[in-house]
Amino acid sequence: MMISEALAGLLNQQIVQEFRASQVYLGMSVYCTGLNLDGWTGFFERQSQEEREHALKIVRFLSEAGAPVSIEAVPGAATRYGSLLEAVSKSLEYERKVSDSFRIMAKVAQEHHDHTGYGFLQWFLGEQIEEENIFARLEAVLESSLNPFQAETLPPKE
């Protein structure tokens, strides 16, 4: 195995978290569809797909590194929220937890002198900065006096 067992275990746990995030964002897209917020529906669908791609990236890395891969069950996701702001706030909270997980993994990789694993994690750490910034900005704007229909112009298109 080309990476530490400790990091491999954490990455396997992260696979579940990435698939979980994909489910959560898909549920949020369903919620937005019910509100006829097509821009937000598309935004959350893209977020869902992106999280799935993150999980697959980890699966491929573990496989190529000769580490065991486990795919655990992912619980269902909510499709109802009190407001669009609630959905975006929960997204930001979740992305912050994911960022914490990747920082912990980077620390474990360093402690085990796992340079390969540490290098792999750098992309995810950069990605998390972007994700947190997007959701923090969206949350801040939604906390203003915008109603959901005015907010329809907010979600990034790509």
Locate the predicted segments by residue:
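Iron-associated oxidoreductase/ferritin-like identity signal
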Residues: 1-158
